[in-house]
Amino acid sequence: KEKKLKPTPYIPQDIEPVSDSDSEFKYLEGKTIKFLGNIKSSLIAYIKWLAKTYNFEADITSDYDKITNLDFRKFRYSDKYAAIIAGPMPHSVKGKGDYSSGLEMLKNEPGYPDVVECVTSEKLKVTRTSINKALQEVNYKLMSR
């Protein structure tokens, strides 16, 4: 009688442990981070898990139409958000003025929270790794204040 082997559970290789001292995210605690961009539902779940684990609030807008109709000017001079983490999004959004995109306006106009882009291979792309890197950058900026 042949013995059947139990399948080993799948462990994704692309997940980097968030355990080294740089990525403790302790300066995010109690803060609200705005996530804007095309974000897959599995990554939204990951962001929510990070928020719960590291005690920060994640305000996520990932729907293309909602981003297009979101007036980015509402983020100006608002102390609601500690930072904005941006992924790929439509160029044309409400309130972008003469800028080529809402993201350009957020990065260049005074009075907006820090904007950190989720970048993979020099392109805006939301992945677990780019989320972790963006949160590390936000954590560092908050620590430096």
Task: Locate each region found by the language model.
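Alpha-helix C-terminal capping/helix-to-coil transition sites in glycosyltransferase folds
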Residues: Y77-D79
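Ser/Thr/Gly-rich flexible loops in soluble cytosolic domains mediating phosphotransfer, phosphorylation
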Residues: S101-R145
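Extended, charge-rich low-complexity interaction segments
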Residues: A82-M105
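Short acidic, S/G/P-rich loop/turn micro-motifs used as interaction or catalytic elements
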Residues: I39-L43, D65-I67, A86-K94, E122-K125
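Short, surface-exposed connector motifs at secondary-structure boundaries
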Residues: E29-T32, I85, Y112-D114
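Phosphate-binding glycine-rich loops and adjacent basic patches that engage nucleotide phosphates
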Residues: P7-I11, S62-L70, S92-S100
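Short N-terminal or domain-adjacent regulatory/targeting segments
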Residues: K1-Y27
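Redox- and metal-dependent alpha/beta enzyme cores, enriched for Fe-S-associated oxidoreductases
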Residues: S21-F75
